[in-house]
Amino acid sequence: MIPKIIHIAWNDKEVLKSDAPLIKHGLKKLVELNPDWDLQISDDADIEAYLQEKMAEDYELAKPLHIVAKTDIWRLYKMFFEGGLYIDIDRLCNVSLAGLIDADTRQVLPTCRNHDFAHDFMLSAPGNPIYKNAVRAWLARRKDGHDSIYFLGAQTYMHVITHTLFDTIIDTNPGDEMFDRMRKAINAVPGLKCIEEDPPHLTVIHEGFAGNWEQMKRDFYAQNGLRHWTGEW
């Protein structure tokens, strides 16, 4: 069973008090529509402490990295040990989680169109081997010297899911036919759901147009004195 916990990583634990449109149409609606779920916000210090506890000596592999890269490995440990929902703070929401899962659901794996498996939305029972394997792959790639946020994060996640479920590594953007086959195979497994999304407006937790999401996100980051991890803005 998936525990009703929402994991958010953000540098301000009072973010729900924000009047930013991104939060109004996202995190606030998520909390409002799912009152029986426990929201847990972890700031940078919480993430550092959690990684030190769970990684032990392997923490040295994460220590020099950007906080975004640390959050990527943190979410894998969180999902494996605790389960629930990990979601990026910039996701829009107007649909309850109640219609997405039931007592038999073990994992929901959205796909970002036919590009890759969504790395910003993880919904699972604890003890999922996908997350265990993802941690192992992350550690192995760090030991090999990799430090790219995208490669260690979203791309490694795609590689691990496909290797765990299909015994072969399938790279990002494998084509419509391949993703159709993968979704069909995953949905045939009891307890698993794989749903195609067209983010940011058409996802498993949002339907319809909510305004200029890109501008909402940029404004929210600016209000918090942050730059996007890509450095583009």
Language-model segments: what does each one mean?
Residues M1-T71, I87-W233:
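Glycosyltransferase-associated regions of secretory-pathway enzymes
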